[in-house]
Regions:
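Residue-level detection of the helix-turn-helix DNA-binding "recognition helix"
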Residues: 40, 54-58
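Beta-hairpin "wing" of winged helix-turn-helix
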Residues: 57-67, 74-76
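Residue-level recognition of hydrophobic positions within alpha-helical transmembrane segments
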Residues: 47-48, 60, 97
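Amphipathic alpha-helical dimerization/coiled-coil segments
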Residues: 1-3, 79-145
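Short alpha-helical segments used as structural interaction elements across diverse proteins
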Residues: 11, 18-20, 54, 66, ...
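N-terminal helix-turn-helix DNA-binding core of bacterial DNA-binding proteins
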Residues: 4-48, 70-80
């Protein structure tokens, strides 16, 4: 079913209007992520992350690509999507939560998915100094924020 421009705008704003979904979109600005990477950052169960991603896909903001056991999510590559994100998130690059998310995403990109997806959201179980350091930096950013 094709949406009218008004219906599409409403659907998009509803999708963006949830803080977790907005965080996910801002994370995806830096490149594609697996669902388990997103879940590790937002600290939500895979089923909840999947629901949020489904809403973002329905709104036409995110696409997925299956790669074996993993599903990679990325922003839809169009100027309209980037324009919307810029319009609704001015100053977000200075937000403590967004900064903490970015620190964690950067560290998690270096962890093999098999390893990351096996720790059930408990990043402290990853025996990796870079993750421990990133968790510490993220906590400091949030405390200062």
């Amino acid at each position: 079913m094709t949406l009218t421009p008004l219906a599409r705008a409403v659907q998009t704003h509803k999708a963006i209007g949830h803080p977790v979904r907005l965080r996910i979109l801002l994370m995806l600005r830096e490149g594609p992520l697996c669902g388990c990477q997103i879940g590790a950052v937002v600290k939500l169960a895979p089923s909840t992350v999947s629901e949020h991603l489904s809403e973002l896909k329905k709104a036409g903001l995110v696409v997925e690509k299956k790669d074996g056991r993993w599903v990679e999510y990325r922003l839809v590559a169009d100027p309209e999507t980037e324009g919307r994100l810029s319009a609704i998130s001015p100053g977000s690059e200075r937000d403590a939560t967004v900064l903490a998310d970015a620190v964690l995403v950067k560290a998690l990109r270096r962890v093999p998915l098999e390893e990351l997806c096996g720790v059930d959201l408990d990043l402290t179980r990853l025996d990796r100094p870079a993750i421990v350091s990133a968790l510490g930096k993220a906590e400091k950013l949030l405390a200062a924020g």
